[in-house]
C-alpha cells in the first residue's frame, strides 16, 4: 500500500501542471471515425480507463499502415497485427482495439489466442469483415490478460461509448495510458491543393522509450484518400523522424506499434505512388511527419520523472544516418542525462557520447566539431566548443540556461556534408527510479 501511495504522489506531482499545458481543451477531428474508452477490468483500481476502440464509420474500407517494435520478444498483439497488415497489405483495416494495464507479452499460446479473440469480437460487434481490426496492448509483461473482462468490455464500449466528440477522443487517449501523467492527443486541419483534410492522433508512452520504438502505442487517422502502399511509406518516413528519434531511458519494449488509417471521407484525388501524385504525396508526408513529431515530443515531455525536454540538433554531418546516430548517442547517455537533471554544464559528457557513436571514419573530426547550448527563449547561445577548441564557459550563464525546462544542444560536425537530424530526450531523475522500482505494485 505504501508503495502505491508513493508512486501516486510522484506521478501527481507532474500530472496537474503537464495536463494543464499539454492536454487540448478542444480539437478538430476527421470525418468518418468514432472512438472511445472505458474501464473494463484490466487495471486493478476499478475505475481507470483501460480499453479503447477506434472505428472507421465512413462506409468504405480504409487504408492502413503500421510499424512495429524490433524487439525479438514481440508481444502477441504485435504478432497478430503484423500478420494482418501483411496479409491484407493494409487494405480494409477499419478498426483498432487497445487494452492498457497488461502487455500480453511473453504469454505463450494463450496470449496469441487472447489477441486473436480481441480481433474477432471487435470485428463481430462492429459488423466488420473478418480480420479488419488491429490489436494493441500495453502494461506489465509476462501476465495473461483478464480476457473475459476485455471480451465483455468490447461490446459495452463499441455499442454505447463511441463517438467523434472531443471528449470521446480524450477518453480514447486516456484508456491507452499506463504510467503516463496525461493523455497525448493532437489534431489539426491542413490543405493539399484545394482539398481540406483533418488529421488526429494519439499515443501513450512515458518509460521504456528508445529508438525503433518502445513501450509506445499510437495511431494517426485522417479523412484524406491514401492508398495503403503510399500510407505505409509515409508512415515509415514519419516514424523514423519522430517516434524513432526520441528516448527516455534507452529501453526497447515488446509491444510498440504505431498505426495509421486513412478512410478518404473528405474526398479528393487518391494519393498513391504514381508520379502524377508526387506533389500531393510530398505534402501529405510533410504534414504527417510534422504531426508525428508533435506527438513524439509529448512522450518525451511526459518521460517518467522528467524535468527537462532536450532537443539534440546535429548539423553538417556526412549523412542523415550519421547525424541521427550521433544525436541518439548523446540523447541516450545516462551521464549526460543526469548532468542535465543536476543543471551541470559538463559538456565533456556530450563529447564522449559523440565520440563513441556508431559512425564511419571521417564522420567525426574532433578539430572540426563545435557544441553549444541554445536557449529556446531566443537569447544568446552559449558556445562550449568551437572547432575542437574549448571555450571559457560562463558558469552563471550556463546555470541560467540549464534552469529552463526546454533546451537545445547544437552539435556542428563541420564535415561539409550538410546533413542533419534532430533527436529528443529528457533528463534522468530520482523520480524515474522511484516510479520504475514500484511499477508492478
Swiss-Prot record:
It catalyses: N(2)-acetyl-L-ornithine + L-glutamate = N-acetyl-L-glutamate + L-ornithine; L-glutamate + acetyl-CoA = N-acetyl-L-glutamate + CoA + H(+). Its main location: mitochondrion. It is found in: Mitochondrion matrix. It holds the Pfam family ArgJ. The keyword Transit peptide does not apply. The keyword Cell cycle does not apply. The record marks 214-215 as: Cleavage. GO terms for cellular component: mitochondrial matrix. This protein may be expected to contain an N-terminal transit peptide but none has been predicted. Catalyzes two activities which are involved in the cyclic version of arginine biosynthesis: the synthesis of acetylglutamate from glutamate and acetyl-CoA, and of ornithine by transacetylation between acetylornithine and glutamate. This is Arginine biosynthesis bifunctional protein ArgJ, mitochondrial. It comes from Lodderomyces elongisporus (strain ATCC 11503 / CBS 2605 / JCM 1781 / NBRC 1676 / NRRL YB-4239) (Yeast).
Amino acid at each position: 500500500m505504501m508503495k502505491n501511495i508513493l508512486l501516486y504522489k510522484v506521478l501527481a506531482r507532474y500530472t496537474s501542471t503537464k495536463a494543464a499545458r499539454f492536454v487540448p481543451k478542444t480539437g478538430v477531428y476527421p470525418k468518418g471515425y468514432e472512438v472511445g474508452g472505458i474501464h473494463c477490468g484490466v487495471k486493478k483500481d476499478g475505475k481507470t480507463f483501460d480499453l479503447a476502440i477506434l472505428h472507421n464509420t465512413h462506409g468504405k474500407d480504409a487504408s492502413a499502415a503500421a510499424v512495429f517494435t524490433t524487439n525479438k520478444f514481440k508481444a502477441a498483439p504485435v504478432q497478430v497485427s503484423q500478420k494482418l497488415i501483411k496479409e491484407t497489405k493494409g487494405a480494409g483495416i477499419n478498426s483498432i482495439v487497445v487494452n492498457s494495464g497488461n502487455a500480453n507479452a511473453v504469454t505463450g499460446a494463450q496470449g496469441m489466442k487472447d489477441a486473436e479473440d480481441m480481433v474477432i469480437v471487435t470485428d463481430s460487434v462492429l459488423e466488420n469483415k473478418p480480420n479488419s481490426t488491429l490489436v494493441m496492448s500495453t502494461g506489465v509483461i509476462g501476465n495473461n490478460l483478464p480476457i473475459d473482462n476485455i471480451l465483455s468490455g468490447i461490446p459495452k464500449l463499441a455499442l454505447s461509448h463511441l463517438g467523434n466528440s472531443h471528449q470521446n477522443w480524450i477518453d480514447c487517449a486516456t484508456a491507452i495510458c499506463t504510467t503516463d501523467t496525461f493523455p497525448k492527443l493532437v489534431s489539426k486541419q491542413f490543405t493539399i491543393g484545394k482539398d481540406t483534410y483533418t488529421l488526429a492522433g494519439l499515443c501513450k508512452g512515458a518509460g521504456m522509450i528508445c529508438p525503433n520504438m518502445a513501450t509506445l502505442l499510437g495511431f494517426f487517422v485522417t479523412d484524406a484518400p491514401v492508398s495503403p502502399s503510399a500510407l505505409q511509406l509515409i508512415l515509415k518516413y514519419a516514424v523514423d523522424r519522430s517516434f524513432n528519434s526520441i528516448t527516455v531511458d534507452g529501453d526497447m519494449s515488446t509491444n510498440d506499434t504505431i498505426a495509421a488509417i486513412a478512410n478518404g471521407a473528405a474526398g479528393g484525388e487518391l494519393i498513391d505512388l504514381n508520379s502524377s501524385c508526387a506533389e500531393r504525396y510530398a505534402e501529405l508526408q510533410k504534414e504527417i511527419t510534422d504531426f508525428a513529431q508533435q506527438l513524439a515530443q509529448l512522450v518525451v515531455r511526459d518521460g517518467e520523472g522528467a524535468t527537462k525536454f532536450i532537443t539534440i540538433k546535429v548539423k553538417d554531418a556526412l549523412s542523415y544516418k550519421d547525424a541521427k546516430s550521433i544525436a541518439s548517442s548523446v540523447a541516450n547517455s545516462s551521464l549526460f542525462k543526469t548532468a542535465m537533471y543536476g543543471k551541470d554544464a559538463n559538456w565533456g559528457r556530450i563529447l564522449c557520447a559523440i565520440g563513441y557513436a556508431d559512425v564511419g571514419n571521417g564522420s567525426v573530426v574532433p578539430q572540426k566539431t563545435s557544441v553549444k547550448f541554445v536557449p529556446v527563449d531566443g537569447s544568446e547561445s552559449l558556445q562550449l566548443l568551437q572547432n575542437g577548441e574549448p571555450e571559457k564557459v560562463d558558469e552563471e550563464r550556463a546555470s541560467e540556461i540549464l534552469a529552463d525546462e526546454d533546451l537545445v544542444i547544437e552539435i556542428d560536425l563541420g564535415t561539409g556534408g550538410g546533413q542533419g537530424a534532430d533527436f529528443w530526450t529528457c533528463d534522468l531523475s530520482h523520480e524515474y527510479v522511484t516510479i520504475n522500482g514500484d511499477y508492478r505494485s
